[in-house]
Amino acid sequence: LLFLFPHETIAQERAIIKIDTDRVIDQINPHLYGNFSEHLGQGIYGGIYDPKSIQADEDGFRKDVIEQTKELKVSILRWPGGNFVSGYHWEDGIGDRSKRPTRIDLAWGGKESNMIGTDEFIQFARKAKVEPYFCVNLGTGSLDEARNWVEYCNVEKGTYYSDLRRKNGFEKPHKVTYWGLGNEVDGPWQMGHKSPEDYSKMAIETAKLMRWIDKDIKLIASGSSNYDADWNK
């Protein structure tokens, strides 16, 4: 074959790729351009929130981070992100900041001040024009904790948790649509690590109660983090 097709001829052959920008195949889901904010390093404190920074706005959020988030056109932002989820109890992070408990962060070490909680993250999301996406604790958390969080965020008034939100200064419901059911529960490094069977049972029951509070929410289950390739089966 080399005698039939000289080296020079082979080397000169080129592939041509044509890109037709006028041909629309389908629309890309804007949520593909989402991200998550994690309580690790300076992801939260010193990152999106730093009241001592010269970039801080009146609520302590960094204006440069807000503007860059807008510039990147981040569509949806998950919180709390990562392993921190499995030890986080949302009621620690609401109400008077001076009365919020400081907890040991079992995921990453150090201490969690709870200065950024549900209402503060909603404030940041609104400023940055991103869709908030909350992830519930299915590691050390409970069914009640998950459904109460939906009540706090999405019920207008007249119940314990909706009225608690109003007492905390947020009369209108936050209307959080997207909710994740746990984080990397397949991994033994995770607080509350579960087998596929145990996770499925808890996720189904948690989803049921959450939807009884608000039927319009959208739920995202936790799949394998690639630790165990067969976990999803």
Give the ranges of each region predicted by the language model:
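Bacterial Sec-dependent N-terminal signal peptides
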Residues: 1-13
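Non-catalytic accessory regions flanking glycosidase/transglycosidase catalytic cores in CAZymes
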Residues: 10-232
